[in-house]
Amino acid sequence: MVIRPSFRERSWLPALAAFVLPLAQALAAPTPPLPPPLEQPKPKPAQVSSSEGMPPLPYPVVPMKRQEKKNPPQPPVLLTKIRSADAGDWTRTPNDVKSLLEWISQQMNVHFSSNIKPFAGISADPAQNPILYRSGYKSFDLTRKEITLLREYVANGGTIVFNSLVGHPDAYQSALQAARSILPEQSLYRLRMDHPVFHSFYEIDKVSFRDRLVKDGLATDPHPWLEGVDIDNRTAIFVSRWDFSLGWEANQHESWGYADADARRLGANIVSYVTAMRDAGRSVGKSVELVNADKKSAGKFRVGQVMHDGPWKTRTAAFPMLLNQFHVATGTPVSFDLRDVSLDDAAIFEMPFLFLTGTTDFTFTEKQRANLRQFLKNGGVLFAEAAEGRQSFDSAFRAEMARVFPDRNLAALPANHAIFQQPGKLGEVKARAALAARSNNRIEMAPELYGIDLNGSLAVIYSPHDLSAGWERAIAPYAQGYEAADATALGLNVLYYAVTH
């Protein structure tokens, strides 16, 4: 006889499974390495009397004043290591930051210093502590006061690096939660290999791991595992899944971490990236507040910004700045308030123009593709740009357009296309330094746009190069795009084409 559970019994089975399965997976997972032992404090020097410490001088000799050699000035502080309340957590690798900076000094001939502070001693001004580094192996929670401080700090241009000591999952999960709590409105995502942090000084692709990580079968991905949260395309928070610190101080204690050489190279690249981006938080767009003269949206050109499963909210001031220039140049009434819309939402059919941007790959659902297809067939226009000129976004966008319109090509627009003619004629544009470096150091080039034509007009307009940094007049050393004047001119032509067609 088969005994079947009653309905009442079956009702709690999913809840039981939801509890038991993760527990079973956790028990089956390899045990993380133990942290290195705490260093024993050095004994205090033996006490000696003053008579023992100074030999008698023969009279009548007068002691000469010793000329002390002045110490060289202290290099500026770059890294501040966070001192938590649990000394058994954060002090396990006491020389990690110091060792990294000494190694960077030898490799790059740049000199920085470090210090140690509790969160209470941190300044919200990044000039006082440019990079905050928190390392430990235990789980932790940020207080509300600490979250408020760190949110202000990263908004001002500061950078936080969370390291999982010995790769411990408790510290890693706590770091992810901390990053989300500091910037809950931004995406937390794994950095793709086209992120500039992997190319800022050393070209990093595949990395080597410590023996324990390999032995436990966790080194399945040969690429570095860093996650981040961005503010206006600047990664302000880094979370490392695998341990840096033991590699920085060449400590051979076993860990789930990077081999010494790659740990140092990754640390050097983070330092290089942060110093290059130190002024990236400043832009003309952030100093200008664009306010609608009236709250009515009727009769105004309205734009919806497409949300997706990648980092989609990039330079928040950029498109309103472009709309303002468009209003000034053409007199077209515009609404500066971009409406965040999902392609699942019927609200997309209430507006004529959608803007899509991002820095990594993304995917649409079948419903989202169907809605976008119908929106475009109804006469709407989709304008997209690869923020920072990132290859991962470019590949994803092309793949999604092929799924939306499998029978049509996203084709390069010829130089004589109407979109390059009005309101300004665009024959050549100037590339930013990052794009020029990728283009055999060519500074002047033809503007590059791609499109999908429906019924004689462009329904999809796409730039594989960054435009929004130019619209915002941003300091963006890694943006592979056009200079501000040309990026704005090209954006104006796109808007003009959309309105007139």
Residue ranges and their predicted role:
Residues P94-L101, I147, R151, Y172-L176, ...:
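Extracytoplasmic/secreted envelope proteins and their assembly/folding machinery
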Residues V110-A120, F162-V166, Q186-D194, A280-K286, ...:
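Surface-exposed patches in mature extracellular/periplasmic domains of secreted proteins
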Residues P14-Q25:
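Bacterial N-terminal signal peptides
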Residues M1-E9:
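N-terminal secretory signal peptides that target proteins for export/translocation
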Residues P30-I131, S135-K138, F244-S245, H253-F353, ...:
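Aromatic-Pro/Gly-enriched surface loop or interdomain linker
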